[in-house]
C-alpha cells in the first residue's frame, strides 16, 4: 500500500482529481463536458486492459529473471511491446478528444495529460516532507 491507502482507493481519488482538474482547466460547456467524459470513459477500459497486460509482462519478467538469456530477452521484449501498446491507447484517447474541444482547449488537454502524472508525483513528494 502506498502512503497508507489501498491502490484501488488511490486510483479512484486520482480519477476524481483528474476529472475536476479537467473541468476547471478546460472550461467546457455542458455539451462538451458530456461528450468529453463519455469518450474518456470509453477509452479508459482500453487503457485499463493495456495496463493490466503491461503489469503481467513485468511480473513475468520479474519472476523469470534467472532464466536463460533467450527467455529473458523474450520477456524483456514483451514488456517493451506492452509498454508501447499502453502508450498507443493513451494517445488514441487524447486524439479522440480533438473534435470535442476547441483548438485552445485541446492544446491544454494534451498538456494536462502529459504533465498530470508528474504533478501528482510532486504533490505526493511534497506531502511527505
Give residue ranges: language-model regions.
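Bacterial Sec-dependent N-terminal signal peptides
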Residues: 1-10
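Soluble, non-transmembrane alpha-helical interaction regions
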Residues: 9, 25, 30, 107-109
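Basic helix-turn-helix/winged-helix DNA-binding cores
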Residues: 9, 13-16, 23
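Amphipathic, charged alpha-helical segments and their helix-to-coil junctions
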Residues: 13, 34, 42, 87-129
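Amphipathic alpha-helical segments
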Residues: 18-100
Amino acid at each position: 500500500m502506498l502512503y497508507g491507502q489501498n491502490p484501488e482507493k488511490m486510483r479512484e481519488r486520482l480519477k476524481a482529481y483528474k476529472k475536476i482538474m479537467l473541468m476547471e482547466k478546460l472550461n467546457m460547456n455542458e455539451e462538451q463536458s458530456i461528450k468529453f467524459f463519455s469518450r474518456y470513459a470509453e477509452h479508459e477500459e482500453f487503457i485499463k486492459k493495456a495496463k493490466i497486460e503491461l503489469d503481467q509482462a513485468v511480473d513475468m519478467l520479474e519472476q523469470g529473471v534467472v532464466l536463460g538469456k533467450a527467455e529473458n530477452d523474450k520477456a524483456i521484449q514483451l514488456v517493451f511491446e506492452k509498454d508501447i501498446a499502453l502508450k498507443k491507447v493513451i494517445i488514441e484517447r487524447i486524439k479522440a478528444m480533438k473534435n470535442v474541444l476547441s483548438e485552445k482547449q485541446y492544446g491544454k488537454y494534451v498538456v494536462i495529460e502529459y504533465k498530470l502524472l508528474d504533478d501528482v508525483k510532486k504533490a505526493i513528494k511534497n506531502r511527505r516532507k
